[in-house]
Amino acid sequence: MKNSKQMKKWLDDLNLSHPLVIAGPCSAETEQQVLKIAIDLKETDVTIFRAGIWKPRTRPGMFEGVGAIGLKWLQKVKEHTGLLTAVEVANSSHVKLAIEHGIDVLWIGARSTVSPFIVQEIADSLQGTDKIVLVKNPVNPDLSLWLGGIERLYSANIKKLGVIHRGFSTYEKSKYRNNPEWQIAIELQSKFPDLPLICDPSHIAGRRDLIFNLSQRALDLNYDGLMIETHCDPDNAWSDAAQQVTPSSLVDIMKDLKIREMTIDKEEYKNQLDGFRQKIDNSDQLLLEILGKRMDVAEKIGLLKKSNNVAVLQNKRWNEILGKMIIDGESHGLSEEFILKIFKAIHQESINHQQNILNS
C-alpha cells in the first residue's frame, strides 16, 4: 500500500470548511435518547453521527449494547437530521446488518484491530461495498499491527479508509484513560500523509475535562478531524459516563478550538523558521554523535564485564542514573515522562551492545 492523494478523496468530497466532527453517544440506549442527541447536533459542525450498537466490554455482565434494533434508530437519525451515520463492527454479521440498514461509516474498534483474523473477516465481508471504513489503533502500542489492519482492508479493494487515534493501554501511571503516544500516530501520518487521521479524545482522556486540550493538540498536529462522545445526559449514560459531553458542551469546544495554518508566505516567517530548523538539525547531529560515543563506552564496559565474568545488568547503577537524570532533566524543562522514555531506550541499546560482546 502506497500513499495516494486519492486516500483523502472521500473526506474532500464532504466539502467541509472545518475539521471533520464525528459525535454521538458511546452507546445507543433508547430511540428517544438517540434522536434527541442527533437533533441537538443537527445545526452544529457535526457531519457524522456515531452510536455504539454492539459494545465489546472488558468484563461480562456490563451493558453490551442494544443490538440490531439500534440500527433502525440510526435510520431515523438520518431521516430527521440528514447526518451521516456510523457504528462499530466486530464481525461479518455486524457488517451485513449495518449495510442492510444503510449505515454510512463503519469503524473497527481497538479490541478488533489487534486481531488479524477479525480484521480479515470484516475486510472479506466488505468487498464490493463503497462504505467509509475507519480503523482505530490497536489497544497495544504497535504501529505495525495498526498498519496491518489498514492494509488488509486496502487489499480487499476498500478505498475509503481512515484511521482513528484513541490512545493505548499501558501499565504506566497516567492522567489519561489511554496514553496518547502521539509519536505512533505521527509516524503513521508520515508514512501516509493523505490517509485521513481522526483523534478520539474521549477515549484517550476518559474524562470530559481533558477533551478540549487533547482536541487542540490533535488539530495542532494536523489531524483531519475529531470523534467526540456526546450524550444528552452524560452523567447517567449507560457506558463511559465520565468521558461524554453534552451537545452544548461540544459546540463550546468546537467554537474555542483554533485551526492553525499549514504554512504562510511571509518572508520574515520563512527566514526565521529556516534558521530555527538549522539549529535543530545541528542539535540532532550532535545528539547522534554523543549517543555514538556513549555506546562506545558501553562496549568497553561490556568487554571489562566479559573479562571478569560479570552480568550485564546492574540494577543499582541503572536506578542511580535514572534518578539523577530525572532531576537534571527537570532543570532543563524536560518532563519525567520524556526522560524515562529516552533513557530507557538508551539503556536498552547499551544492554544490547554489551550482550553482543558477551556472546561473541
Regions found by a protein language model. Give the residues of each.
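N-terminal amphipathic alpha-helix/helix-capping segment at the start of soluble metabolic enzymes
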Residues: 1-22, 76, 255, 265
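Catalytic alpha/beta core domains of metabolic enzymes, predominantly
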Residues: 14, 118-249, 256, 261-269
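Active-site mouth loops of central-metabolism enzymes
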Residues: 19-36, 60-65, 84-89, 109-110, ...
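Hydrophobic faces of well-ordered beta-strands that scaffold small-molecule active sites
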Residues: 19-25, 47-51, 85-87, 106-108, ...
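Catalytic domains of carbohydrate-active enzymes, especially glycoside hydrolases
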Residues: 36-53, 101
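Glycine-rich, proline-tolerant flexible connector loops at the mouths of alpha/beta enzymes
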Residues: 50-68, 232-241, 301-312
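Catalytic beta/alpha-barrel core
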Residues: 66, 82-91, 95, 104-119, ...
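Domain-level signature for soluble enzymes in the chorismate/prephenate branch of the shikimate pathway
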Residues: 262-360
